[in-house]
């Protein structure tokens, strides 16, 4: 016989005792998070070896330990050693501090557990998402409409962009015997197209372009990368030459993927110029604005995105410079007719009958079926804070970056590697008279040492053949004084370990 009382206590439901238990557990969870926030250390977990020792396995029992005891355990092994992304020294990645409104929205999203694949599973959310997509389209210059959908993030949105572009290009270049356009959805990819159809992006584009084309069966060989200029933007001369060469070789450029905010340098490609070339070669233009799309709300830097309205599709991520909790992204499509390449009717979800009666059909716009109502986070934030405060928070990081760049240029033993553009600083430590062959190792280990001690999270990447440190200065609460203090730590740490590295007596903290 089932124990319904225990079932109700375990389930989120309208049982009075279950509601009381929920309120108590949520209160305790919030208290634990508040205590974690008050600990000013950025990270307390130590090295990877220390973390593996702390989390040595997963061994649930048949009886269970109870909610409170399990919560206490999770505070110990998960919450306390988690990275504090709001800390002003947590600057390694596009990993943002989050809005309070986003945190509150998560409670509502989780409590209601709506699914966006059909209107009857999310009656309010489906309509709200359509309105928010319409608002985003107008911000981007696409005009009114609902052609777009919320996604899990940039990789999925980029997949939608290159997928639709490929199928659009094949429909334009391959025909059936009766003269109708070829449908990849119905008939698969023509054998000839596997070698002919290409996608172009810059060498600094997100790796998801290659990854997605491989998942689509086209392989890495279908992606042609072009060099970047000194500012890490797509080189327009190289792009024009690449387009011409591909055409001369009998290839078809299905899509040019531009970037508005490269992962490392924050570079924003010249969208207007790329649009002209895309038109000349009849190519789709997709822009990966996962990061730079935040400038749609900017007061001072919106012009960085001039030309975004000319693209065919756009990737946006709200869990980057929009300060929303992970995950929250969107894909915008200019021409709704191009959704035909992925449209599918399932009678139990999006029947033609429902569509004829004005029922929202979001599943036809998405690669996902079951999908969270993540749009609520952005809706709540915009409605609560307003566009002016949002713009101020977005612009803060861009202004801070310029100040940090000037400080680095004025500081001995520090060197900028790429001029700052958006909210990223690529630099390195170069001690005077230090042997060049040890510079890369020095910078790598400075970052590793500071992270292992919980003092800073600085990114490590490559600029050409040089090992670079990276600070993603998007935090709306970080100050120049915070960054100066961090750079002082960087120089102090470099001075501490540089001789041991040179002499071969240094042991990296990651070992």
UniProtKB/Swiss-Prot annotation:
GO molecular function term, any single one: diaminobutyrate decarboxylase activity
Superkingdom of origin: Bacteria
Coiled-coil ranges per UniProt: none
UniProt entry tagged with the keyword Lyase: yes
Cofactor(s), by name: pyridoxal 5'-phosphate
Pathway: Amine and polyamine biosynthesis; 1,3-diaminopropane biosynthesis; 1,3-diaminopropane from L-aspartate 4-semialdehyde: step 2/2
E.C. no: 4.1.1.86
N6-(pyridoxal phosphate)lysine, modified sites: 320
Keywords per UniProt: Decarboxylase, Lyase, Pyridoxal phosphate
Any single GO BP term: carboxylic acid metabolic process
Gene Ontology annotations for the cellular component aspect, listed alphabetically: cytoplasm
UniProt keyword Plastid, yes or no: no
Family: Belongs to the group II decarboxylase family.
Name of the protein in question: L-2,4-diaminobutyrate decarboxylase
UniProt organism field: Haemophilus influenzae (strain ATCC 51907 / DSM 11121 / KW20 / Rd)
Lineage: Bacteria, Pseudomonadati, Pseudomonadota, Gammaproteobacteria, Pasteurellales
